[in-house]
Amino acid sequence: MEELRGYLEIDRPHQQRFLYPLLFQESIYALAHNHGLNGSILYEPMEDLGHDKKSSSLNVKRLIIQMYQQNHFIISFNDSNQNRFLGHSRNSYFQMVSEGFAVIVEIPFSMRLVSSLEKGSESHNFQSIHSIFPFLEDKLSYLNYVLDILIPHPIHLEILVQSLRQWIRDLPSLHLLRFFLHEHQNWNSFITTNTKKCSSFFSRENQRLFLFLYNFHVYQFESLFVFLRKQFFHLRSISFGSFLERTHFYGKIENFVVSMRNHSQNILWLFKDLFMHYVRYKGKSIMASRGTYLLMNKWKSHLVNFWQFRFYFWSQPGRIHINELSNHSFYFPGYLSGLRLNPSMVRSEMLENSFMIDAVIKRFDTVVPTIFLIGSLAKVKLCNVSGHPISKSVWADSSDSDILDQFGRICRNLSHYHSGSYKKHSLCRIKYILRLSCARTLARKHKSTVRAILKRLGSEFLDEFLTEEQEILSLIFPKTPFHSGRIWYLDIIRIHSLANH
């Protein structure tokens, strides 16, 4: 790591032009396989892949030469059964080089992020997903309309390569990136309009590289809001370019290349809104404003045109929905959120006269999406589409303790994430489904009945589904029922797969 940092510190003005030689340094591949950097991305053990033999610069050079020389219409890297390279499958070598290449292309953006954090101490980086909701709770109560946006991602990858040229001027690296994109078996999935096929594009083998490309695409999309904000508020910008799974609220850009400045001065007056707020998680974002419906409709029209002329991508206007906050709930992320109107009567007395005043208080409300959660449980075969619990036959061969641990972990994760809901009674149904599904799985394993399993396990069975916050809150607030409290945790950096249906 120190060697890599030293290389980058030698000549900062020219470092973007010499990324390609880094591909032949073995320290890059050791960095790529560092689990601390890759987070939840799973990789095969080093001993299974023969990492010491594979990551030599000679092997990498031979692989890249063959990539340039091969006939793309005859040979495919993804045919691991027929194509072998030095005793290993081509696919494993392709995976190894793509991992190293992903680290290399992140370097210019990571260096900007580090330099920005050193210069600006007021930049906030909230890692917890739950930190989004206190922000919404403080802001949305005073706003009127919300734009529910699905960010268009099925664009042609050549557009991403062209966009990267603004930041990376190393042409060999960009050419190599094109080879990676054409060689990948799911290359066409990214340019299709089928969302389910697009999700398969981020494969296990090349997840880091394509996650980088997707985040860069979203970064280009969000640059519009930064540009407009700078025009009105004249704030000094700082960098933003982290490609890990984090949540950034106050990310701004330094040295942003504005390609539309000459054409935007005539339309900026349409979007001057001091109360516009923007929040995004993954491919979904919301824009809330205190303005009128006409203003929000202008924003919608401009976003569609921006996607078309900036990314050469035709986006249907139906991907953006305008809704009034007081009459609409939006799904973001893992919650059904909206504004609840609480009417109240206030009595005011003045001398001998008294007045009754009707007051309405807006409160940001978060509800557990029971239907979505049941659909997620049905997908993993824990219940049917009606919510009726069924046994998990795949886990029937595991030990009793492993089965209890699996179901208990799912229950605790869902309860932990949805602890911010005002009413948690709907979670009781989800816990009931998980408990009964667990009991049926154990009964299937032992060829017994659910009643016999519950009688044999007793309190041990229920303890597996008791969450920590229930125990802690009962001690801190003994008079406050757990279902009426709302807690936001600052240690949640990702949504459980069942919660993010």
Swiss-Prot record:
GO molecular function: RNA binding
Keywords, comma-separated and alphabetical: Chloroplast, mRNA processing, Plastid, RNA-binding, tRNA processing
Location(s) in or outside the cell: Plastid, Chloroplast
Domain of life of the source: Eukaryota
A Gene Ontology BP annotation from the UniProt entry: mRNA processing
GO CC annotation: chloroplast
Classification via InterPro entries: Domain_X, Maturase_MatK, Maturase_MatK_N
Purpose: Usually encoded in the trnK tRNA gene intron. Probably assists in splicing its own and other chloroplast group II introns.
Family to which the UniProt record says this protein belongs: Belongs to the intron maturase 2 family. MatK subfamily.
Official protein name in the record: Maturase K
Classification lineage: Eukaryota, Viridiplantae, Streptophyta, Embryophyta, Tracheophyta
